Amino acid sequence: MNSSSANITYASRKRRKPVQKTVKPIPAEGIKSNPSKRHRDRLNTELDRLASLLPFPQDVINKLDKLSVLRLSVSYLRAKSFFDVALKSSPTERNGGQDNCRAANFREGLNLQEGEFLLQALNGFVLVVTTDALVFYASSTIQDYLGFQQSDVIHQSVYELIHTEDRAEFQRQLHWALNPSQCTESGQGIEEATGLPQTVVCYNPDQIPPENSPLMERCFICRLRCLLDNSSGFLAMNFQGKLKYLHGQKKKGKDGSILPPQLALFAIATPLQPPSILEIRTKNFIFRTKHKLDFTPIGCDAKGRIVLGYTEAELCTRGSGYQFIHAADMLYCAESHIRMIKTGESGMIVFRLLTKNNRWTWVQSNARLLYKNGRPDYIIVTQRPLTDEEGTEHLRKRNTKLPFMFTTGEAVLYEATNPFPAIMDPLPLRTKNGTSGKDSATTSTLSKDSLNPSSLLAAMMQQDESIYLYPASSTSSTAPFENNFFNESMNECRNWQDNTAPMGNDTILKHEQIDQPQDVNSFAGGHPGLFQDSKNSDLYSIMKNLGIDFEDIRHMQNEKFFRNDFSGEVDFRDIDLTDEILTYVQDSLSKSPFIPSDYQQQQSLALNSSCMVQEHLHLEQQQQHHQKQVVVEPQQQLCQKMKHMQVNGMFENWNSNQFVPFNCPQQDPQQYNVFTDLHGISQEFPYKSEMDSMPYTQNFISCNQPVLPQHSKCTELDYPMGSFEPSPYPTTSSLEDFVTCLQLPENQKHGLNPQSAIITPQTCYAGAVSMYQCQPEPQHTHVGQMQYNPVLPGQQAFLNKFQNGVLNETYPAELNNINNTQTTTHLQPLHHPSEARPFPDLTSSGFL
């Protein structure tokens, strides 16, 4: 046993693909007589006919050798005999009338569909092993878990699939008493391949327990050979089933008598580690391809044909397998290819494969190198389709470094000449003289002919340009994304060429600069001369027949084209009028229509209005004793309103040229004495800290200046105030100048209408009066009024300003063209009266 255990072998794909049979033409001189050849031809014909009757796909049948055809034929007949007995179907039912045949075929079709669905829902595969360790039956789903096809394991020794350390345990589970050492029959021998006793003991059914006995149930774990993407090469499987009689085999003993049915293990093998949800969803789409060592496809299973759409002949006759890989993924796959050649496994990689309908599908792949006689023989690639979102996520995480080392010769297999045609060159090399496109095409053709057919760039050149320029994907937004990576891969290849030094005669990477026209650019660049050299291609003809222009493709690439709003309509209901009104109020509060004059220039003005000012001051002195209490409280209210509205600093960003309609509600003519006592200048004003910081300004209308007439209904008077020219005099910020500017004459003879009252307050206070209602406020501190004193410099400036009579101010045409007269001009006070009386608000028309 020890000597034979050294020659332990595992299951592998031993059969070779038979040479395709071709019918030779009959020679003209006639058929030569060769009995042995005629016998071989007749035998091959019968074997081909027998193979066509097997219940396997045609691609599996084409790969079977003669011994495999005979082996599978015997196993199929044995399985059919078992089911005939198990299902108790009589020959009369099978050979009945036409109606019975139709009903039987219908039931058979239903049963077949039900069985397929059950196998798909099962997390594992079905395995039937006889007591002599032969695989009686294995379901087709064994390929999804172990990588072996159904035809590879049927009627083969099960020990070729089992790990050497688990074979003894598996043999013990095959015995009904879990004690195979009791088999001391003369037929017992030693199997050379496994080193285990090969028992041929036949039991009488009366000597063993019945089928429904608990002693016949089995549940154990062993490791099976796995060709899929696991590092150890074995997969731990859980076997759960029972020993049952295998009917209908009709085996004969040594004396020629028919032996009774023998026991066999009917079990379901499931992976010990349960699969994830993702594996459950995608396990039915896993397909496998077989390649040569240079990645040339030589086979594909049925699921691969469904996913990719190619037939096996189309895959195997196109040459290098890199023709089916996206250009942006070629270098990435080539790196994994070299890793697999060195280590025997590529690891999990994600890339794009080209389907038959010119679509790119993302797959997760793992390649394994299989050996024969100690030498690499071929490559088995297991691939699982992915969604576009999963593939894009893997692509963003991919390392974009150069995979090859040019100094060690790893890039020798991938020639790096520049064979790109004008339409595919992502970064054309422009020459000084600017050669034409025809010369470039000729150079490209020569470079393409000089390429090694098995090189990476040769495979890229054999791809159709339309799969990158016009990808037939479900969403057009993926086109720029794919072309972007395609151009990046082209640039990487070109960088390889630029950085490569000669290494030898035949093993160097050749670099040839191809002259390209300057109007040729990449697809994503949107150059005006794009695709000029492709107008004679078949692709251009197809697009012309479909009515598609290259300009349409440019619009499809532009993502902004899909996001533009071409309605051009503005819904005024979407405009927030509240913000506009508040903005206008704030602007009106922060702008002054009157600009003061300079204090230095006021003293140099001529004294032409002394009579008017003296009369004004005389009237103020007469009324100061009667209106002292009336003035103090409104003045405090005015300061409180200014503090509440926070008008400090609101007059900085104003524009005197802005047109602002000013609404002035007409009030009943009232006379208020603003300042009755000007001797108390030394007394501290309670709101001086707030008033001094405010750049309050005000100018006055000249004595002979015409004003606007009174409104007919005495409601509101709207007139523009934005065209006043700014005064050349700087603003005053002191409290004295502020107090001085508020004094206006009340009884003046200007020849104007006495019924009209002109209102000249600041714009900010007009807004304050209209937007806030005057409520009685507590009186904090009474301010001693200042009586006019001509000796004071501030008052003297005020007197000189009005005695001159010429203020050099320009007013709108609406004010200059009115010839009304007024005997007395009443000043609308800038503060509120003592009684609680709400002021009328400005109407919305004044703002809108």
UniProtKB/Swiss-Prot annotation:
> Where, per the database record, does this protein carry N-acetylmethionine?
1
Q: Subunit composition?
A: Homodimer. Heterodimer; efficient DNA binding requires dimerization with another bHLH protein. Interacts with ARNT; the heterodimer ARNT:AHR binds to core DNA sequence 5'-TGCGTG-3' within the dioxin response element (DRE) of target gene promoters and activates their transcription. Binds MYBBP1A. Interacts with coactivators including SRC-1, RIP140 and NOCA7, and with the corepressor SMRT. Interacts with NEDD8 and IVNS1ABP. Interacts with BMAL1. Interacts with HSP90AB1. Interacts with TIPARP; leading to mono-ADP-ribosylation of AHR and subsequent inhibition of AHR.
User: Which cellular component appears as one GO term in the record?
Assistant: cytoplasm
Nucleus as UniProt keyword:
yes
Q: Where is the PAC domain?
A: 348-386
Keywords assigned: Acetylation, Activator, ADP-ribosylation, Biological rhythms, Cell cycle, Cytoplasm, Disease variant, DNA-binding, Nucleus, Receptor, Repeat, Repressor, Retinitis pigmentosa, Transcription, Transcription regulation
Expression induction: Induced or repressed by TGFB1 and dioxin in a cell-type specific fashion. Repressed by cAMP, retinoic acid, and 12-O-tetradecanoyl phorbol-13 acetate (TPA).
Tell me what happens on changing residue 154 to D: Interferes with transcription factor activity
On modification after translation, the UniProt record reads: Mono-ADP-ribosylated, leading to inhibit transcription activator activity of AHR.
**Residue ranges of the motif Nuclear export signal:** 64-72
Instruction: Report where it is expressed, by tissue.
Output: Expressed in all tissues tested including blood, brain, heart, kidney, liver, lung, pancreas and skeletal muscle. Expressed in retinal photoreceptors.
Region annotation Disordered: where it falls in the sequence: 1-39, 824-848
Motif range (Nuclear localization signal 1): 13-16
Matches recorded under InterPro entries = AHR/AHRR (IPR039091), AHR_bHLH (IPR033348), bHLH_dom (IPR011598), HLH_DNA-bd_sf (IPR036638), PAC (IPR001610), PAS (IPR000014), PAS-like_dom_sf (IPR035965), PAS_fold (IPR013767)
Q: Which disease is it linked to?
A: Retinitis pigmentosa 85: A form of retinitis pigmentosa, a retinal dystrophy belonging to the group of pigmentary retinopathies. Retinitis pigmentosa is characterized by retinal pigment deposits visible on fundus examination and primary loss of rod photoreceptor cells followed by secondary loss of cone photoreceptors. Patients typically have night vision blindness and loss of midperipheral visual field. As their condition progresses, they lose their far peripheral visual field and eventually central vision as well. Foveal hypoplasia 3: An autosomal recessive form of foveal hypoplasia, a developmental defect of the eye defined as the lack of foveal depression with continuity of all neurosensory retinal layers in the presumed foveal area. Clinical features include absence of foveal pit on optical coherence tomography, absence of foveal hyperpigmentation, absence of foveal avascularity, absence of foveal and macular reflexes, decreased visual acuity, and nystagmus.
From which organism does this entry originate?
A: Homo sapiens (Human)
Q: Name one GO biological process term.
A: apoptotic process
Per the UniProt entry, the effect of residue 381 to D is: Abolishes specific ligand binding
Q: Where is the composition biased (Polar residues)?
A: 1-10
Residues forming the propeptide are 1-10
* Protein name as it appears in the record: Aryl hydrocarbon receptor
